[in-house]
A protein has these predicted regions:
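Short alpha-helical elements
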Residues: 1-229
Length: 229
């Protein structure tokens, strides 16, 4: 098979293969299927436009769908996140999270409904994420762009319940205020710390800690399948 920069290295494949524990003989190699998925993720091509050096697109799509519904992809993601955190000298379970949302224009009509974000004048969808102090994803929710942040933020915070026992604080921007702060503490036992911008400053300033979650959104831009959910 042709080599692409998105192909898994041997060490990367060994990590995934050990998690799958799938020793069955198949017509197409599972590694080649993963390589096809990563190629699509990076280039943003359509399933039907996958290069012929990969397994048939129908096969790749089938496995991707099965792994998604069975939680295999999430399992791999969580395992890799844990490895990175431990390598950085951190506990598997974070004590701090950072939350933010991003409205994205999209013309895709299938799947999640679209809406208009009145504040940003964006028609499409919004993704709400919570990351750890390294910028690694802890939870994500995608919804119509017109859904209020406090409503969708509750959904994404709810995904953390019972998963991260050490999580006690989430840092947010000025869009998360009022009753939402108290409701988050009451419902989930999590403190929401709001860090505001210095509006009186004419120059650009990096907001302490907040840049971490903003950098994660920037990472998404490197993969053409991710900017438009």
């Amino acid at each position: 098979m042709k080599k692409y920069s998105t192909n898994l290295t041997d060490s990367q494949w060994n990590i995934i293969n050990n998690l799958l524990q799938d020793k069955r003989s198949r017509k197409y190699k599972i590694r080649d299927i993963f390589d096809a998925i990563f190629y699509l993720l990076k280039t943003g091509c359509q399933w039907r436009m996958l290069p012929h050096c990969f397994p048939p697109w129908e096969t790749v799509y089938y496995y991707f769908t099965v792994w998604k519904h069975k939680g295999i992809i999430e399992l791999i993601h969580e395992h890799l996140r844990d490895k990175i955190r431990m390598k950085a000298g951190k506990d598997k379970s974070p004590s701090l999270g950072l939350i933010d949302s991003q409205s994205v224009k999209t013309t895709r009509s299938g799947g999640i409904c679209r809406g208009i974000d009145g504040g940003k004048k964006t028609k499409g969808r919004k993704r709400h994420i919570i990351v750890d102090s390294l910028g690694l994803l802890l939870a994500v929710v995608v919804h119509a762009a017109n859904e209020h942040d406090s409503k969708s933020a509750t959904k994404v915070i709810k995904l953390l319940k019972d998963r991260f026992s050490r999580l006690i604080k989430i840092i947010a921007d000025g869009g998360y205020r009022g009753e939402f702060i108290e409701n988050t503490k009451t419902a989930f036992g999590i403190i929401l710390e709001v860090i505001l911008r210095k509006d009186d400053s004419p120059k650009f300033h990096v907001i302490p800690k907040r840049w971490v979650v903003e950098r994660t959104f920037a990472w998404f831009e490197s993969y053409r399948s991710l900017p438009k959910p």
